[in-house]
Amino acid sequence: NDPIHRRVLDILPNRKKECLIQYYSYCKNRHSVEFVISDMYEPYLLVTQIMFPKAKYVVDRFHYITYIMDALDGIRIRQQKEYNEKSREYKLLKNKKNVSLLRKYSNDIDWWVYTKRYKNGHMVDVLPIDVLNEILTISQDLKEGYYLKEKFLDIIRHDEMMNVEEQFDNWINNCIEKNIPEFIEASKTIF
């Protein structure tokens, strides 16, 4: 891709290591490439090391975010399975709007706009903060997972990237300290 002109440069027949090496062998400036941005597909890392020896391999942040959201969803689903389908907790954890609220970055939520929700069989106006607080009281793991997700997004969305490595180290240590399996696994993808 050409990110500056926003256009696709080429599409390869497959993404196998051999095909990629052959394709990049025609690249004249490959020894002066400084960065390669990609997803976490292992052959991409290997091809980068072989074909762009001076380049730093940068994983697209979207892929990290996906791992973090999957970890949060994993906690939600694990907790949901502990409740009867008719219980309030199960319904709160299953509700698509609530799932969306959990996944959304808190800085992107308009906390003071009422939404209509069913509560105790009646349609009522509720604030997102009230819904979120009710969901997070269901499980300590879910609450801690939510705050780990928020901290992760704080780090990667911050304009100033000073001390980012230290921030990620602290975040990883926090994941390990909280001992939430889904986030321990997700934290292994960082660095």
Predicted regions and their residues:
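Acidic/histidine-rich catalytic cores and adjacent linkers
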Residues: 2, 7, 23-54, 58, ...
